[in-house]
């Protein structure tokens, strides 16, 4: 089986970049890091797992919120160090409550001109404090 090239080293951990994309619309939902163990769990379960560089641990997307990502297809780039997971997103992908983490549009001078997406859930109702 071909595996990603986990060439990015952060906090001593070998990682690759993972992009979650809506399998129907092509909308980019989020970008995260993934290590070999999280990649293997993702392939085995067909549910997205990532590696948190701030918590130094694997996390199952939706473990706390229930907003999981069901894997439909996996793509590797030419260097095999970036992965696209084409997913069926259940609920929102972003911890802010938005469907996608990419909901801010910037003007030419870099100012946020709009948040063009309504929230699909209230984070205060989902995440423990």
Swiss-Prot record:
It holds the Pfam family PRA-CH. It is found in: Cytoplasm. InterPro entries: PRA-CH, PRib_AMP_CycHydrolase_dom, PRib_AMP_CycHydrolase_sf. The keyword Flavoprotein does not apply. Catalyzes the hydrolysis of the adenine ring of phosphoribosyl-AMP. HAMAP family: HisI. Homodimer. This is Phosphoribosyl-AMP cyclohydrolase.
